[in-house]
Amino acid sequence: MHMDDFSASLGFTDRSSRGILDTIEMIEKYRLDIRTVTMGISLLECARGSMEETATAVYDRVTSQAARLVEVCEGIERELGIPIVNKRISVTPIALVTAGCSGDPVDVARALDKAAKDVGVNFIGGYSALVEKGGTTSDIRLIRSIPEALSTTDVVCGSVNVASSRAGINMNAVNEMGKVVKQAAELTKDRSAIACAKLVVFANSVGDNPFMAGAFHGIEEPDCVVSVGVSGPGVVSRALGNLQGATLDQVAEEIKKAAFKITRTGQLVGAMASERLGVPFGIVDLSLAPTAEVGDSVANILEVMGLDQVGTHGTTAALALLNDAVKKGGMMACSRVGGLSGSFIPVSEDKGMIDAVRTGAISIDKLEAMTAICSVGLDMIAIPGDTPAETISGMIADEAAIGVMNHKTTAVRVIPVPGTVPGDEVDFGGLLGYAPVIPVNTVGNSEFIHRGGFIPAPVHGFRN
């Protein structure tokens, strides 16, 4: 594909030299990239009588289906000149696959890890359970195996859905997940509690999310599908750089135009990958995904709008404007939009968020408020190592309540790094970045968490 054709696909219909140069500038100077091409694979056909046989079937299925994924993505990168940062796989929630098996589900986690490494992908997600209305024997067994599974593998990611707007919040699962997070941290204490960076606790999880660590291949999905997650915070920041004095509705209009171009890129890459791999094209996830590099920050976009630093009063409103404009621009560019589709605010993966935590401009309470707007929730936040399991469960319950009451996906991915106190810094390496340890509320909540049971669904969740 020639660069003028690529430029036209982004919305530069005049195919002018300006459009071509603008495209090149977005890629080279403003870090426009495809954050992930994720292949979703159904493993329902892999269930066998024993865990060992199931693990073998899972390995064979993943390696055969994804054999050409990395090769195809690298070919598209060379052809278009646009980086595809990650190639990933999501699979059917493993608690469903192992429901009829005797044995230890960690065997399947290790098979997934080996399969992912053998085909060359960065991560594989789906060591997951869906327990918003209660857990089966298989669900409970998998949840209790998560600390070992994530601490003894390198690229396997896990998630648990504990709530939905139709079912309410499963507080028994919330209580359990606080303990699981603490155990996972303890088992990887010599590696900055890295297992916790691969574990997400959801409300209203979705089965077509291409982003890690919360990706899994939903049971409503086909046998195999390829989806795309875009990036491009730098492109949006650049678009707003010339708007000094503009009104906020003008700012929103400019964000929509930038989101259109970013999403068009994702749709083009997804369509090419789908055709070359011979599998259906799933969705483009519109989420703006930052990195810890300078010029690739969602927080910086909010500051370009006029905030002296993210975290001050007005931050949630600025994030609402950004999130809505990204969705509107992206939906005009692609008819197959899905996943989480909004703005990610992971602390360790966003230079602006890291700086705000360092200076005390943003607190965990403000981060919680922002999650009422953004795609995910309390994401990649390092907290003190002595934080009790009940406090973590309280964070999960609060996030689930926001998601359930607002019919949106929310999640918690916090990392209680053993031996750390507020102000320490933790380096997770690579795309996961680094983060200052943020203070948390130390007032107790254990009686509330230990009550268990369910928080009922809201009345507006009953829509039939």
UniProtKB/Swiss-Prot annotation:
Q: What residues form the membrane-spanning segments?
A: none
Which InterPro entries would you find in this protein's record?
UPF0210 (IPR007841)
Which Gene3D superfamilies would you find in this protein's record?
A: 3.20.70.20
Which family, according to the similarity comment? Answer: Belongs to the UPF0210 family.
Q: Which HAMAP family match?
A: UPF0210
Its subunit composition reads: Homodimer.
In Swiss-Prot or TrEMBL terms, this protein is called UPF0210 protein Cgl1545/cg1743
- Organism of this sequence: Corynebacterium glutamicum (strain ATCC 13032 / DSM 20300 / JCM 1318 / BCRC 11384 / CCUG 27702 / LMG 3730 / NBRC 12168 / NCIMB 10025 / NRRL B-2784 / 534)
